[in-house]
Amino acid sequence: MGRVRTKTIKRASKLLIEKHYPRLTNDFDTNKRTCDKLAKIPSKRLRNKIAGFCTHLMRRIANGPVRGISYKLQEEEREKRDNYVPQESAIKTNEVKIDRDVEEMLKSTLEFPTIPQIHVVDQKRYNKNTKKSNK
């Protein structure tokens, strides 16, 4: 079973990733040296634990967004996705096909005006008695 990480280690790692994301990598040794330069960590053992958890989180971030950690690159990607407007609409309203029953219903209830995009199509009725042969 793995070792339990304290709140201090998790908090410190989270802050380091949020503030210095581009400097950290998936390699423990480089993260250890980076943590040493960026923060004043009182002991070697604590520094190694923080660097190890940073490495763990960086590997998780590579797979996808991690809950509780927000860094600038991730926020920019999220904004791009939210503000994306397609060139052509997915819902094309060039032509809408309706059958005679729907047309009558629209005219009677809504006093529906004639719109050029709406085309009335004869609907073929489904016959229950016809059977398909399996030949």
Curated annotation (Swiss-Prot):
Pfam family, one: Ribosomal_S17e
Single annotated GO MF: structural constituent of ribosome
InterPro entries (alphabetical): Ribosomal_eS17, Ribosomal_eS17_CS, Ribosomal_eS17_sf
Record's keyword annotation contains Ribosomal protein: yes
GO terms for cellular component: cytosol; ribonucleoprotein complex; ribosome
Keyword annotations from UniProtKB, A to Z: Ribonucleoprotein, Ribosomal protein
Keyword Hydrolase belongs to the record: no
GO biological process entries: translation
UniProt similarity note: Belongs to the eukaryotic ribosomal protein eS17 family.
Matches recorded under NCBIfam families: PRK01151.1
HAMAP family named among the record's database cross-references: Ribosomal_eS17
Full protein name: Small ribosomal subunit protein eS17
Source organism per UniProt: Dictyostelium discoideum (Social amoeba)
